[in-house]
């Protein structure tokens, strides 16, 4: 259904087409519509990616290169699907010193953060005298890192996916990213990859890249898992191949929610609202406030901010904020703002307030929570340290940000000594008999004792 905009007088003042809603005046169906994202229904994409996946599975490099030319409009062949050492070296000469410095700054902070996340290799606890149980963590043997490029170049995604994987100790890492028309890979992406510790990059994007790392080709080695955000094509391919490869957390088009109280200026809220709205027309971006003043100031400031942005990014953000997946939501109280935020479960959430910690305890459903007036999403996306690859489409209700633990697997460890064995055997035997498992029972019966007495 189409939501009906509220308080049209605000729109008239600014001469902008920004979706504006009074939350308390929406019925249940309209509130549910506000929660929808652009990729809520990807059934059409599931059908479209099917022949691409099958072609890569059966034709390998030939199909991968063909789709690179047809879909990415790039000069790629079967011979140049993998980035060479010379291309890596050349990238460092193409990147400005200031960008190189900022990439290194971000990588250093991301590494510091994720090193704190790394679990101990193993822990054991004495559950009962002589009986020990614990966990052992080992890295996943091969992981593919998807770095999108459709609406820009994203070395930051390379940083966010590569660093935790390297910290986790994954031995076989490879980046897949769409090539430029000349067949090259974004120079800053290659710089970030090498500085983070990844030296394998394939020139492939979209559904065909997901298929390549799932099935493997003559050039692309198959991986056990793929992580990283992507378009609906990538999301559909991941969903289709979830029985072939671990597709990680669901990361689709960008989302942001700015929860602003009455301690801030609405122009600041509008400034931060545009951060994720400019990613593309499939993004989602809402300013949520119970302050009419903040709402009016935000609407008044948007044209000023747009005037300072590039034409492409302005167009993207206007599409989002005037459409069905973005705008300004005016609530009747701060409690109603909390209600909407938790129902929405955003990817990025800013608590834009001079006193953000008074709001934090009321938020239960958000993947990333940025506090105060000096922590815009920009800083989190590029350099703060916490991972910016986050679950979208309300998956923040069950998933968290990409982390070191996404690149390791856990094995439980058990060790029962001879003195502790009889007590555990007795209780295990009782439950085995009750559940009707005769072999379970025999394994902790006198039959075992007899074999133990015989020895080797």
UniProtKB/Swiss-Prot annotation:
UniProt keywords, alphabetically: Metal-binding, Oxidoreductase, Plasmid, Zinc
PROSITE patterns registered for this protein in UniProt: HISOL_DEHYDROGENASE
Alphabetical list of Gene3D superfamilies matching this protein: Nitrogenase molybdenum iron protein domain (3.40.50.1980)
Cofactor comment: Binds 1 zinc ion per subunit.
Lineage: Bacteria, Pseudomonadati, Pseudomonadota, Alphaproteobacteria, Hyphomicrobiales
Annotated GO biological process: L-histidine biosynthetic process
Name this polypeptide is given: Histidinol dehydrogenase homolog
Annotated EC: 1.1.-.-
GO molecular function term, any single one: metal ion binding
């Amino acid at each position: 259904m189409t939501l009906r905009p509220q308080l049209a007088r605000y729109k008239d003042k600014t001469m902008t087409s920004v979706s504006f809603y009074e939350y308390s005046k929406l019925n249940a169906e309209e509130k549910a519509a506000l929660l929808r994202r652009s990729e809520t229904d990807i059934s059409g994409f599931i059908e479209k990616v099917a022949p691409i996946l099958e072609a890569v599975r059966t034709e390998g490099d030939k199909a991968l290169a063909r789709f690179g030319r047809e879909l990415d409009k790039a000069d790629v062949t079967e011979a140049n699907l993998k980035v060479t050492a010379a291309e890596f070296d050349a990238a460092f000469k193409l990147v400005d010193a200031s960008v190189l410095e900022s990439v290194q700054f971000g990588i250093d902070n991301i590494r510091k953060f994720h090193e704190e996340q790394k679990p101990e290799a193993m822990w054991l606890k004495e559950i009962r005298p002589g009986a020990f149980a614990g966990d052992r963590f080992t890295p996943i043997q091969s992981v593919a890192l998807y770095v999108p490029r459709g609406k820009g170049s994203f070395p930051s995604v390379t940083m966010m996916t590569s660093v935790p994987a390297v910290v986790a100790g994954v031995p076989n890492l490879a980046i897949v990213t769409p090539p430029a028309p000349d067949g090259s890979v974004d120079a800053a992406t290659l710089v970030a990859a090498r500085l983070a510790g990844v030296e394998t990059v394939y020139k492939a994007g979209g559904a065909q890249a997901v298929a390549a790392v799932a099935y493997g080709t003559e050039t692309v080695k198959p991986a056990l898992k793929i992580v990283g955000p992507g378009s609906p094509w990538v999301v559909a391919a991941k969903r289709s191949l979830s029985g072939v490869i671990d597709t990680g957390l669901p990361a689709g088009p960008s989302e942001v929610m700015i929860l602003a109280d009455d301690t801030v200026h609405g122009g600041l809220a509008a400034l931060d609202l545009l951060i994720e709205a400019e990613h593309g027309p499939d993004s989602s971006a809402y300013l949520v406030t119970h302050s009419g003043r903040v709402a009016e100031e935000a609407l008044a400031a948007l044209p000023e901010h747009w005037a300072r942005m590039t034409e492409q990014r302005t167009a993207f953000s206007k599409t989002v904020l005037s459409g069905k997946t973005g705008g300004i939501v005016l609530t009747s109280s701060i409690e109603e703002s909390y209600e909407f935020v938790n129902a929405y479960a955003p990817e990025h959430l800013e608590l834009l307030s001079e006193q953000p910690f008074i709001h934090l305890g009321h938020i239960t459903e958000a993947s990333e929570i940025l506090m105060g007036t000096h922590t815009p999403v920009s800083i989190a996306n590029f350099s703060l340290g916490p991972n910016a690859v986050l679950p979208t489409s309300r998956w923040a209700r069950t998933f968290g940000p990409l982390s070191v633990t996404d690149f390791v697997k856990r094995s439980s460890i058990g060790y029962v000594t001879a003195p502790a064995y009889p007590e555990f055997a007795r209780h295990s035997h009782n439950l085995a008999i009750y559940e009707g498992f005769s072999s379970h029972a025999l394994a902790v019966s006198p039959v075992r004792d007899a074999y133990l007495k015989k020895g080797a």
